[in-house]
Amino acid sequence: MLFRSADQRVDISPREGQLYTDNRPDGDMLPILRQAVASTDSSLFVVLHMYGSHMDYTKRYPKDFAFFTPDDASAVNRETKDKVRNAYDNSIRYTDYVLDQVISVLDSTDAVTALFFCSDHGEDLMDDDRNRFLHASPTPTYYQLHVDSFAWFSDRYRELLDRKSTRLNSSH
């Protein structure tokens, strides 16, 4: 809802008629973020809605991020479980890279900056005897409900708002 009500928004999702899996890589948002940060001299609130690690995982990262191989699962079953996990891990690795780049952009300015990241769901990757896969099942598993999140604060943020960030950092 925040995204739809923003004064200015940039949507890099597929155009109407394209498949949802045709989303562009999350890294395509980085030049837009760099431009927004560079062109403002006032307060700025940015929401980056990343597509992240969704099936087909191999389409969620550039080929040069294929660190865990083989990652070419053409089907999802017990026999391809390791390939599926490799592709998923590569997508996580790419997300880590994108978040590192976002932090670099925020850290490169003298502004008071912060980042909050939170996944919207976890994922089943045939992690137990039930061999469940994906998310959004009627009875969610631990793997679907466990989501990663973190907060990052610039040095300037911590200097100016030390008590608040210390309290937040100590509450995890």
Where are these regions (language model features)?
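Catalytic domains that recognize anionic headgroups
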Residues: 1-170
